[in-house]
UniProtKB/Swiss-Prot annotation:
Low complexity composition bias: residue spans: 68-79, 590-604
Organism: Homo sapiens
Binding partners and assembly: Component of the multiprotein chromatin-remodeling complexes SWI/SNF: SWI/SNF-A (BAF), SWI/SNF-B (PBAF) and related complexes. The canonical complex contains a catalytic subunit (either SMARCA4/BRG1/BAF190A or SMARCA2/BRM/BAF190B) and at least SMARCE1, ACTL6A/BAF53, SMARCC1/BAF155, SMARCC2/BAF170, and SMARCB1/SNF5/BAF47. Other subunits specific to each of the complexes may also be present permitting several possible combinations developmentally and tissue specific.
Biased composition (Polar residues): 544-576
Role this protein plays: Component of SWI/SNF chromatin remodeling subcomplex GBAF that carries out key enzymatic activities, changing chromatin structure by altering DNA-histone contacts within a nucleosome in an ATP-dependent manner.
Protein name: BRD4-interacting chromatin-remodeling complex-associated protein-like
Region (Disordered): 51-79, 509-604, 669-691, 837-877, 917-954
One GO CC term on file: SWI/SNF complex
GO BP annotations, alphabetical order: chromatin remodeling; negative regulation of cell differentiation; positive regulation of cell population proliferation; positive regulation of DNA-templated transcription; positive regulation of stem cell population maintenance; regulation of transcription by RNA polymerase II
């Protein structure tokens, strides 16, 4: 933990004075210092934690006061404060707090105490059936506060992150809610999932309610909480059939929200498969019996990677005998109360709840997400909305709508729900009476509420307000049969590129009383088990909400006779193809005989799939669906051919809907409308191979574009399997029409060539212009009187090297002035010789000496060929020259070796030529030794690499002799340069013999020449040892000489010296001139 000046507290632990100075500063510090204002007293000045909760969060103690929940006792000396050191080094169990609000342990205690206080207040309120939430609305944190209200033991085991408090803003909720304010009390929170993220939430649309909604799970990894505090100052009235809910729910409505990626809002409340419906119709006036709203748990399942955050608000204790669960479904939300919220709808509770138009649902707003989900509202203006679960249940034909309760919400759109006339589902004031056939369709005015925009990944926008996957099938009530049909609980689709973990979309069918049917859910969804068939005129014949998972999708269906609910992660499809949401379709039914049944063949098993799935690009229902159109039949979009499922639904009465889903054959069902009195629902199934016919809403151009895109996709990823039939071959080959075209002609090629040439020419011109500009800049910089900074640096470096080389030359001139002058003159003569050889003056004289040099050169070329070097003499120079440079560097200065190094620097072209000339001139003086000079290093290199040809002592003596011979030859170079008039001729002859690429020689011949040269070197090495300078140089050069070490020295030491000498090229000339002038 570092403070502003990067001084670490751990460094100050052992020194109380330094720590006091670090904490409080010098005595003359200003009175407005952060730590001085923090209220440190003299008694506890030695304690870091004294009044740490009052300290400014931006002070240097913020890490200590935030990360440490409790400090040691006052007056604890810092020199022995080991607890501080341990707490400093350990990771804090509490979450990292922001600087907006420092940690306050009192606040945390109050938050924990508020749970009990809230429970007591709510019980008192429920008993008195009136009251205000003012008494516990004060127990809220600042919306942006991130102080932890969670015990460390609850959260630290998961991901180290803890829940953040939920900000609350008080919003008036209308005239009936004027006297009530809503506060979300921070209940006792505990983790259920793994690695729960910490996010802020705020309740933007406030509601009143007499119960709690426990929200388990997360919307896009955000924890959230809902409370219903006051219901219009009254209670929810239970008006049931005298049957109680089964007791396996344990007293709470469990609204199961499966949100694969936190976007879909399809809630499954699952209590019991065979429960009786409990309708709770209330307008704001008629209340009959006081019914305590029990703990409503809204559980939202999450994506495989997301986390679950349950927020448990303890409700009033529930009597085990009288357990009623309530399905809080789509509740009417006024526009000014909704702020990008989510109205929670449950889809599969065994008991339908009837909620009045004025009840609002608390909207959980996601502050920290950029993609708030749009709130969906269901409201009825004149009557009550009966939201039935898809389970098979008896129902008395009330004048009520059956509204599907699944809402698919786009995560990218932020639209406010319109007012009542523009709400998503709006019913006419005239309700359906018992003898009426759906004269008012639920999906009225679907376009007026600008709900959702289509996202690209969402392949099946159902309604014109794309992604308003409020796939509503208006369930109509039937007078004659008295068995109402419930709505299609279409599954919400994920939008925004999320991977659809499909929700259950139990599509419920209108059935006659005596007939049984199975509604096939979307494949890949996991839902609750359902009643398969229920007989009796007052029951739903069969409503199967168990949307079974297709086996190939790897999903599973959780089924069980006792309504098991999803609490864990939902299942994911392996094949990751976003299955579109089910299409909104209107099911026309006659009042007296509604006998359209879709019976699933027993062979399909768990592969049930209702035809209401759609994967069309767009099903634009731009015009609001008016009420009389409900009898037109169901408008069905194309079915995705994702699953091979055959649904030969057969009707016991008059209709057959056969949907044959091929693996790649989407279909479109067209429903022929029928009058209310006729039971005709006819579905024509058009199966057209890969090409699916367009829906009614598709224009011709859109369909052509769609077909082209499909053909292009098939062309890019062709099916390489065998043709099954002629039609299959035609279908698969016709898609290649998008690739039509002709081969490029000569004209096309010429045009491309011209374009390329134009571009290349322009590029070259621009490059040349840039180079010219750079040269001009360099020239201008050179002509400046005041040089630029770059030139100044270059000059400094140059001058530094010049001074170093000049001092070295001065030392050399002082030690051996004659040798220095001789080297200087030698370098000039060598330069002249190099130029003469370049002009091609050659002669045949000295062919004997050149031939004596040639076999070693060939052997060297042979050896160099292995390393990729083709110029043997040139490569030999890099070993010969550094030998002499090393000798001079160790103090045994031979003027000839320095002359050699300078010759290399003077002329790069004459590098090979100079060495060969120097050796040749030495050979004029000592013919035998000169012929052995060049092969010397090569001979020792060969023998050292082939240690089996001789003993180590013999090799060492040979190598020593070779080096002696080289130094000797160099000592004679000066005189040979002056005395030999034919040096140039000899040099050119040597270049003629060895500089040209040598043909391949036989290995035996090269080995013989190598051994001959070694023997000659041994003989010749004994002669020059009488020279004292040479012998001294040998002793200094090779004190402990071994064959391998000598080669390493040649390779490692000599080449760096040689490169160092090349850098000093220009400075040596100047130094030589200066030395001559000094002499």
């Amino acid at each position: 933990m570092d403070d502003d000046d990067d001084s670490c507290l751990l460094d100050l632990i052992g020194d109380p004075q330094a720590l006091n100075y670090f904490l409080h500063g010098p005595s003359n510090k200003s009175s407005n210092d952060d730590l001085t204002n923090a209220g440190y007293s003299a008694a506890n000045s030695n304690s870091i934690f004294a009044n740490s909760s009052n300290a400014d969060p931006k002070s240097s103690l913020k890490g200590v006061s935030n990360q440490l929940g409790e400090g040691p006792s006052d007056g604890l000396p810092l020199s022995s404060s080991l607890q501080f050191l341990e707490d400093e080094l350990e990771s804090s169990p509490l979450p990292d707090l922001t600087e907006d609000q420092p940690f306050d342990i009192l606040q945390k205690s109050l938050q924990e105490a508020n749970i009990t206080e809230q429970t007591l207040a709510e019980e008192a309120y429920l008993d008195a059936s009136i009251g205000s939430s003012q008494q516990f609305a004060q127990a809220q944190l600042h919306p942006s506060s991130s102080a932890s209200f969670t015990q460390a033991s609850n959260v630290s085991n998961y991901s180290g992150q803890t829940l953040q408090p939920i900000g609350v803003t008080h919003v008036p909720v209308g005239a009936s809610f004027a006297s009530n304010t809503v506060g979300v009390q921070h209940g006792f929170m505990q983790h259920v999932g793994i690695s729960v993220p910490s996010q802020h939430l705020s309740n933007s649309s406030q509601i009143s309610g007499s119960g709690q909604i426990q929200l388990i799970g997360s919307f896009g990894n955000h924890p959230s909480m809902m409370t219903i505090n006051n219901l219009d100052g009254s209670q929810i009235i239970l008006k049931g059939s005298g049957q109680q809910a089964p007791s396996n729910v344990s007293g709470g409505l469990l609204v199961h929200r499966q949100t694969p990626n936190g976007n879909s809002l399809f809630g499954n409340s699952s209590s019991s498969p065979v429960a009786q419906p409990v309708t709770v119709p209330f307008n704001s006036t008629n209340f009959q019996t006081s019914l305590p709203v029990h703990n409503i748990i809204i559980q939202r399942g999450l994506a495989p990677n997301s986390n679950k955050v349950p927020i448990n608000i303890q409700p009033k204790p529930i009597q085990m005998g009288q357990q009623n669960t309530y399905n809080v479904n789509n509740l009417g939300i006024q526009q000014h109360h909704v702020q990008q919220g989510i109205s929670f709808a449950s889809a599969s509770s065994p008991q339908g709840s009837v909620v009045g138009p004025h009840m609002s649902v608390n909207i959980v707003n996601q502050q920290n997400t950029r993609k708030p989900v749009t709130s969906q509202a269901v409201s009825s203006t004149g009557g009550s909305i009966v939201i039935h679960s898809p389970m098979g249940q008896p129902h008395a034909p009330q004048s009520q709508f059956l509204i599907p309760t699944s809402l698919s919400v786009s995560s990218n759109s932020v639209h406010h729900v319109q007012t009542i006339n523009g709400q998503l589902l709006q019913t006419q004031p005239s309700q359906l009476i018992s003898g009426q056939v759906a004269s008012e369709h639920v999906m009225l005015n679907r376009n007026s509420s600008n709900m959702l925009r289509t996202n690209q990944p969402y392949t099946g926008p159902m309604l014109n307000n794309q992604n308003t996957a409020v796939h509503l099938v208006s369930g109509q009530t039937f007078a004659a049969s008295g068995s109402p049909v419930i709505a299609n609980h279409a599954s919400p689709q994920l939008v925004g590129g999320q991977m659809p973990l499909q929700q259950a979309s139990p599509t419920v069918l209108h059935l006659s009383p005596g007939q049984s049917s199975v509604s096939q859910g979307r494949p890949g969804f996991a839902t609750m088990p359902s009643v398969t068939s229920m007989s009796g005129p007052s029951r739903f014949p069969a409503v199967s909400s168990a949307s079974t998972a297709h086996p190939s999708l790897g999903s599973a269906v959780q089924s069980g006779s006792s309504g098991s609910n999803f609490t864990g992660d939902q299942l994911t499809q392996p094949n990751r193809t976003p299955v579109p949401v089910s299409v909104s379709h209107r099911l026309p039914v006659s009042s007296s005989k509604s006998t359209s049944t879709f019976s699933n063949t027993p062979g399909t098993g768990t592969q049930q799939q209702f035809f209401c799935q759609a994967q069309k690009k767009c099903l634009n229902q731009t015009s609001p669906i008016s009420a009389p159109k409900t009898t037109d039949g169901l408008r069905q979009a194309q079915i995705p051919g994702l699953l091979s499922t055959t649904l030969p639904g057969q009707d016991s009465g008059s209709k057959v809907i056969s949907a044959s889903l091929g693996t790649a054959q989407p279909q479109q069902e067209k429903v022929v409308g029928s009058s209310p009195g006729h039971p005709a629902v006819q579905v024509e199934s058009h199966s057209g191979g890969q090409k699916r016919p367009a829906a009614k809403q598709l224009t011709k151009g859109a369909f052509i574009l769609q077909q082209l895109q499909r053909d292009q996709a098939h062309t890019v990823t062709p099916d390489k399997s065998h043709f099954r039939s002629l039609s299959d071959a035609v279908q698969r080959l016709l898609s290649y029409h998008v690739c039509q075209g002709s081969m490029p002609t000569e004209e096309d090629l010429r045009k491309v060539d011209n374009e390329f040439e134009t571009v290349a020419t322009q590029l070259l011109k621009r490059t040349q212009a840039m180079l010219n500009k750079y040269r001009c800049l360099l020239l201008e910089d050179a002509m400046r009187i005041n040089p630029s900074a770059e030139m100044v640096m270059i000059d400094r470096m140059f001058n530094q090297e010049e001074r170093a080389s000049l001092s070295r030359d001065k030392r050399l001139a002082l030690v051996d002035p004659e040798g220095f002058q001789a080297d200087f003159c030698c370098s000039f003569k060598l330069d002249k010789a190099a130029h003469e050889t370049q002009f091609g003056r050659s002669d045949q004289h000295g062919s004997k000496a050149s031939s004596s040099l040639q076999p070693p050169a060939k052997a060297q070329g042979r050896d160099r060929a292995k390393t990729g070097v083709t110029e043997p003499m040139n490569h030999d120079q890099f070993h010969l020259v550094p030998n002499h440079i090393v000798v001079s560097a160790e103090g045994n200065i031979s003027k000839k070796t320095e002359c050699l190094g300078r010759a290399l620097k003077f002329d790069k072209v004459g590098l090979v030529q100079y060495q060969s000339t120097s050796e040749e001139k030495a050979s004029r003086r000592e013919p035998l030794k000169a012929s052995q000079c060049s092969p010397g290093p090569e001979g020792h290199r060969k023998t050292s690499s082939r240690s089996d040809h001789g003993t180590e002592s013999k090799l060492s003596s040979i190598l020593a002799d070779s080096h002696l011979e080289m130094t000797c030859n160099n000592s004679f170079q000066d005189k040979s340069l002056r005395n030999s008039p034919k040096n140039e001729v000899l040099h050119t002859d040597i270049m003629k013999g060895s500089g040209e690429p040598q043909p391949d020689l036989q290995l035996t011949k090269s080995l013989e020449t190598t051994f001959k040269n070694i023997l000659e070197l041994k003989k010749a090495g004994r002669q020059p040892q009488s020279d004292p300078t040479v012998s001294g140089s040998v002793e200094l050069d090779f004190p402990n000489f071994s064959p391998m070490a000598s080669q390493e020295n040649c390779l490692e030491k000599f080449i760096p010296d040689h490169s160092e000498g090349v850098v000093e090229t220009d400075s040596i000339l100047e130094a030589a001139v200066n030395s001559i002038l000094e002499c």
